[in-house]
């Protein structure tokens, strides 16, 4: 990866997938604590279930900057305001992508994959770019927390090169 005028440097990407983790909050807590980008696709459970913010404490989040995408039906109603107070630094360290409408499950994987590809594409994607890439489910998405970001993709030159080793 190369940022601005810095010398290029190596970095690692680790992708964790969980399938069928719909009753226990343990895998979600592990993923939240150990990720810079957390992407969830599944039921919002009407605000209850394993992702209920009441199941989490500030200790379940890293101190680093983090993006969380809660790709479930009307997830904005259940998650947009409750995770932010749990995160050290609030919106300076957490951007939360949520859906205002129902998100059809049959296109969710495609939308999540396109979001991730745009994020890791090697350029400097803005949230507009990321949301346009993930529009397959057209769930009226919103990003909370981006207004006070220090990093601005339009002001930084980041280049990611993927090599096979």
Residue ranges: model-predicted function:
Residues 1-75:
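Catalytic-core segments of thiol-dependent peptidases
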Residues 67-165:
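Active-site-proximal C-terminal subdomain of hydrolase catalytic domains
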């Amino acid at each position: 990866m190369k940022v601005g005028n810095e010398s290029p440097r190596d970095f690692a990407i680790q992708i964790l997938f969980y399938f069928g983790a719909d009753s226990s909050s343990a895998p979600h807590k592990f993923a939240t604590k150990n990720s810079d980008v957390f992407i969830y696709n599944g039921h919002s459970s009407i605000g209850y279930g394993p992702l209920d913010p009441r199941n989490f404490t500030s200790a379940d989040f890293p101190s680093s900057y983090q993006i969380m995408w809660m790709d479930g039906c009307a997830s904005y109603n259940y998650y947009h305001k409750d995770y932010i107070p749990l995160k050290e630094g609030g919106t300076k360290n957490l951007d939360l992508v949520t859906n205002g409408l129902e998100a059809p499950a049959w296109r969710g994987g495609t939308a999540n994959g396109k979001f991730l590809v745009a994020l890791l594409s090697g350029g400097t994607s803005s949230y507009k770019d990321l949301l346009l890439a993930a529009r397959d489910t057209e769930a009226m998405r919103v990003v909370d927390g981006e207004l006070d970001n220090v990093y601005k993709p339009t002001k930084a030159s980041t280049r990611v090169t993927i090599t096979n080793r």
